[in-house]
Amino acid sequence: EMLRSLVGSEMCIRDSNWTMLTDHTIKFNKLLTPFSFLYGIGVRFRNQLFDWKILRTERYDLPIICVGNLTVGGTGKTPHTEYIIRLIKDRYRVAVLSRGYKRKTSGFLLADQRSTSKDIGDEPYQMKRKFPDILVAVDADRRRGIRNLLALPENKRPEVIVLDDAFQHRYVAPTLNILLTDCHRLYTQDKLLPAGRLREPVDGARRADVIIVTKCESCIQPIDFRIIEEDIHLSAYQELYFSRILYGELEPVFSGKAPRRTLKGLASTTEVLLVSGIASPAPLEKEIHKYTEHVTSLVFPDHHAFDRHDIQKIQTAFKRLTSTSKLIIITEKDAARLRDLPSLPMEWFSHLYCLPITVGFCMDREKQFQELIVKHIDTRIKNHPI
């Protein structure tokens, strides 16, 4: 938790400066370098125990797709996990298994329509709301979580399990390991915690079958792709893809209380209060600035648990907006935490919107990625029928 808080403070500095490091942060990172060295010794030793088979990795017959990263902070795991769900949910019985970060419960929990973000965590709650027909489960012990999913009745038992943020959970061996890295801060250019954001050394990327460089600009040039490809040093068995964020239509947080709107439909005079409690809010703010110059941003820590004091802070900022056309925009993850609070001001109901995001693949390789996923699942099921 100490490491997480140190890194969290660093990320606030990065986001507020569009990922530019300040002199203060650089000096701070240098002071933390010895701790990164010690942390690296521990992580390398743990990985060696798995490589030497002293710590046992569990293997399963059904397809298990892991979506993860080498760093703390936002690389886009949730939208990429949702992309895979959307691709395969009508073909197979799908389960998503997550740790359920910052939930108030413990152990294995299978989500249902009554589950809240406090029960299962922000991301699992968001996925269950979006895809009510799939199985969403949480358990910090992924092996136990998988055992519980496979113990379900045959007509409910998953044919495919997607592991959300489990790249470092080496007690489970995925059949397909997908590693994400932010285009603006590749893992090859980062440092170990707490001086940087790496959870483990760069050579951990060798466990990946697929590497996706995320959050690319739509105007990125072919030369940029080649530079990144050379920097990552792919192994022969690895495939490289590039993806970008796609922003959807604004959705009322309280259905029926506000009209549907689009970012493109915003008037240039519209005032927006952007409230975010995510790891990397800067790209979102940049996107909204394309449509209106009048953006006030309130940034909270990632996975922040909003309380009445936060509501008052947001309300004060909202009242300062003087335009007759004004709204509050939040992320889908923040909507999961705000929606059920009992103390929301009534006037927000007609002004509160969330901005959903999806991902698209660059260089016309979307179909190739889809075929890779489906072929992997079909081959695995054919060779290991459930």
Language model: regions and residue ranges:
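A transmembrane-helix-recognition feature enriched in membrane-embedded lipid enzymes
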Residues: 14-62, 376, 384
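C-terminal accessory "lid"/substrate-recognition subdomains
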Residues: 16-25, 186-324, 383-386
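Residue-level signal for inorganic ion chemistry
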Residues: 38, 78, 127, 164, ...
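Walker A (P-loop) phosphate-binding motif
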Residues: 47-113, 218-219, 383-386
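Phosphate/Mg2+-binding loops and adjacent switch elements
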Residues: 100-103, 107-238, 242
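Short, flexible loop segments at boundaries between secondary-structure elements
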Residues: 246-248, 300-305, 347-379
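Acidic beta-strand-to-loop metal/phosphate-binding motif
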Residues: 326-333
